[in-house]
A protein has these predicted regions:
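Conserved protein kinase catalytic domain
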Residues: 23, 44-47, 95
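Short amphipathic alpha-helical interaction/hinge segments
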Residues: 23, 51-58, 102
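Basic/aromatic recognition patch in beta-strand/loop cores that engages polyanionic ligands
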Residues: 53-85
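Compact soluble domain cores
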Residues: 39-54
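Short, well-ordered turn and helix-capping elements at secondary-structure junctions
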Residues: 13, 30, 54, 74, ...
Length: 102
């Protein structure tokens, strides 16, 4: 059986901050962390998928030289770059789909 190739993942500081702020916003807005936990789980699922198939269902955004994946009922967007030479995925931004596009 052929083993699946898994790329490394690196979150930029900006992406980490955006992700944490989103989770905090929904926890405060809903007065509960249950929705934030769902966002976290769906994000981890997507990142895992990207590590093995980075181009699957992704749109390339030439102006920012990054790939874009919309996920979790089209509510959130992950922007990332693929560095095949270093076998790494760089998560650049985590955004709500209601925010102004990059």
């Amino acid at each position: 059986m052929k083993q699946e190739h898994i790329m490394k993942v690196f979150w930029t500081e900006e992406a980490k901050i955006e992700f944490k702020q989103t989770l905090m916003y929904w926890t405060i807005h809903n007065m509960s962390d249950s929705y934030s936990k769902k966002i976290d789980v769906e994000t981890l699922k997507l990142v895992k998928e990207i590590t093995t198939s980075p181009y699957l269902l992704a749109n390339y955004i030439e102006t920012i030289d990054a790939y874009k994946r919309v996920f979790f009922k089209s509510r959130f967007i992950l922007y990332y770059q693929v560095d095949e030479k270093n076998d790494t995925i760089y998560i650049l931004h985590f955004r709500s789909s209601s925010q102004k596009p990059l």
